[in-house]
């Protein structure tokens, strides 16, 4: 059988990944911002070489990429109805299609083809739709900073974990809260 010595959460796993990627050179306090498909977690950790200690952690169980996909589906459904006068039927624009379009929106405005219609969606429209979700994540970050009792200026870096951290609005939000550009050098979730 398998012997499990310790269970760790995703932000801690992300911190360990960055610690090992740096060959043990990291020392100090770090934030790990984990926004994946289904959940959001933020942790303040202390890293000393290969040792990672969680100082504070918080999260939102119902916030992730799936919610952003749903938001994009809503935009597409509204625009389709406006252009055609018809409701989209179940399965006309699937969650998988929304996820692919979301990834494209992280790079540029998009024009997905829905049935026979081309629907233009700008990144700013998408960002407007998800901004309230990002605001909740910001409040959670501020809460975990307060819980950690670590001064914002003592945090060395913010590590991004999870596919949804590729969304430019997410990165801007992290920069605004932590007053630094986040580190997104690797995709530890892949």
Predicted features and spans:
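Oxyanion-binding/catalytic loops of NTP- or PPi-dependent enzymes
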Residues: 1-190
